[in-house]
Amino acid sequence: MPRKEKIGLVVSDAMQKTVVVAVENRVPHPKYKKIVVRTRKFKAHDEENRCKVGDRVRILESPPLSKTKRWVVLDILDEARNP
């Protein structure tokens, strides 16, 4: 079975070699059929600490790296702009 890939936004980089990535999923409401945005947060391994808050990244599913970390950052798609 292929590994899953997701694209999301880095919302926290406070940990060492770990970032929290928020992934948005748009699904229709079961009763009202309106498109609803659901957000899930995943902890992802960032070996070189390259990711910053606001970066758009691609993450790849991996075997468990810790109690809550099951994803690895593949690459940074868009870097956050610093004002």
From Swiss-Prot:
Question: GO biological process annotations for this chain's record?
Answer: translation
Q: Which GO terms describe its cellular component?
A: cytosolic small ribosomal subunit
Query: Could you tell me which Pfam families the record lists for this protein?
Result: Ribosomal_S17
Q: Which CDD domains match?
A: Ribosomal_uS17
User: What SUPFAM superfamilies does the entry give?
Assistant: Nucleic acid-binding proteins
Q: Does the keyword rRNA-binding apply?
A: yes
Which Gene Ontology molecular function entries are recorded, alphabetically? rRNA binding; structural constituent of ribosome
> Is Disulfide bond tagged as a keyword?
no
Gene3D superfamilies linked: Nucleic acid-binding proteins
Which keywords appear in this protein's UniProt record, sorted alphabetically? Answer: Ribonucleoprotein, Ribosomal protein, RNA-binding, rRNA-binding
Report the protein's function: One of the primary rRNA binding proteins, it binds specifically to the 5'-end of 16S ribosomal RNA.
Q: Subunit arrangement?
A: Part of the 30S ribosomal subunit.
Which family is annotated?
Belongs to the universal ribosomal protein uS17 family.
Protein name per the record: Small ribosomal subunit protein uS17
Native species of this protein?
Answer: Gloeobacter violaceus (strain ATCC 29082 / PCC 7421)
